[in-house]
Amino acid sequence: MSKYCPLYEIAIYADCLECENKICKKEMENKMKYNKIVIGIDQSYKRTGITIVADDKIKKITFIDFQKGFANNSEKREYLREKLDKLFASIKDKSNKIIVVIERIRLRSEGFLNINYIKSIGALNSIIIDSAYKYNYPIYSADTRAWKSKIVGTSKPQNNKYFVDPKKWPTIKYICSIGHKKDILLKLPENTKVKKYFEIDGEKYLFNDDAADSCCIALYGNLPLNQTTLKEEK
């Protein structure tokens, strides 16, 4: 039996078995479901938001909650590694172009250089970068002000009635405006001790700003590279 080989043209099946290039590129390309997949990640030790955008469409907005069940940050990083490995493995055959975008470390917060913050987030970033590297996914970082300006349209704080930090509200508001409000809602347990919340049909909720941020980061990474200030991380 012969087949078309993208490297050596027509080859018989026996030749394929001897070939070191086990993956027939042309056949694999035909099997790919999407032209481009972007994974946006808003990383923190409280919650890490993760969004998948495929061919310009938001496919999934989710998050990893680190607030309970972990003794220290090392356990959180290891758990994140496991989750990312499963995610990255699940999409590897769905596109030839998969990139990961994380939020760039802010060296200064309100004018101060927070060394402990930089070290802890740097360690978290290394987990994400190494996980992406394992699957040969290019990984980029997005400046907070850049993605907010390009996707949300503003980074100016806005007051709101939902007890959301004014700095976070523009992003929440934007995600709601594009039809993904339900994806960034956090339903609170009945016995919750949280004092600030809002209600929908008698149920208590908060907005998940980490999930919202990850969505905007993914949408920013989906733009043509020359329209962004993305920086490749290695």
Spans of features found by a protein language model:
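N-terminal low-hydrophobic presequence detector
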Residues: 1-2, 40
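Cysteine-cluster motifs in flexible loop/terminal segments that predominantly coordinate metals
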Residues: 2-28
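Phosphate- and other anionic-substrate recognition elements at nucleic-acid/protein interfaces
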Residues: 28-234
